[in-house]
Amino acid sequence: MPKQLMIYEDAVPISTERHGEWSVKTGADYSYARGLNSVPLLAAEFIPAATEFAIIFAGEGDSIFPSVILGMRDGENSFVGEDNAWQGKYVPAFLRRYPFVFSRSEDGGTFTLCIDEEFNGFNQEGKGERLFDSEGARTQYLENVLKFTREYQAQFNRTMQFANRLRELELLEAAQARFQLPDGQSAALAGFQTINRDKLKALPGETLAEMARTDELELCYVHLQSLNNLTPMAQRQTAAARTTEAAEPAPEKPAGKKK
């Protein structure tokens, strides 16, 4: 399952000295997400994401964090089309934040805004939005990026608290999803956890009431409901695989000898 920097190849701190003349052109190209079959999801995203994604919990111990499943097999994302466009209704904030990310100091007290210099849209030809103006000041674009990244980090911390709460209440259990491949073979997606509905319902009334007040209880049931998306997602990926196979030209037959 994913790490927080899994799509960043060369994230470096943004500075006027290094990036004063650089611009960023973003758009509908999600090729950087093609090989991701899951990405982290913030608690604030549960409701919009649950309409089409299955929300699960990845990681172990105090690193457990919610994620959305994007593909039923490693290295496959069924929401990135052949034209690299996003084919879903909702784009997770983890992907919308790219190519920017915060790096944290060793003491955890300072965050520095970084950019992945390997991003295809990072250029010195003036394409897209500049990071700094002619006087070396942040552009409005960079200010907006900084605001979004700060909000993301704040929501990340809140989501981590929610995940830790579930772990402390021992509500999570290992799970797997089974599905059929185009060739008729069965396969399974494992290595993630889900909430045990019976354990959730068996919590003391005071605990459930507290979770209801903090919206944690709603998040739990949104997660459980989202698991119904596993079957249509498997069907989506199977249909895409069959379409790809049908589009591939058949191998040419060897030429026979002339009589």
Q: Where do the model's predicted regions map?
A:
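Short, extreme N-terminal leader segments that mark the start of a protein/domain
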Residues: 1-70
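Short, basic/low-complexity N-terminal boundary segments at the transition from targeting/disordered tails
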Residues: 30-34, 75-84, 155-162
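Short linear motifs in intrinsically disordered
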Residues: 43-48, 91-93, 167-171
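A short, compositionally biased
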Residues: 49-52, 96-97, 172-175
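Aromatic- and glycine-enriched beta-alpha-beta binding-site module
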Residues: 58, 65-131
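Residue-level signal for pocket-adjacent positions within structured domains
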Residues: 64, 74-75, 195, 206
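A contiguous, surface-oriented mixed alpha/beta subdomain in the mid-to-C-terminal portion of proteins
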Residues: 102, 106-259
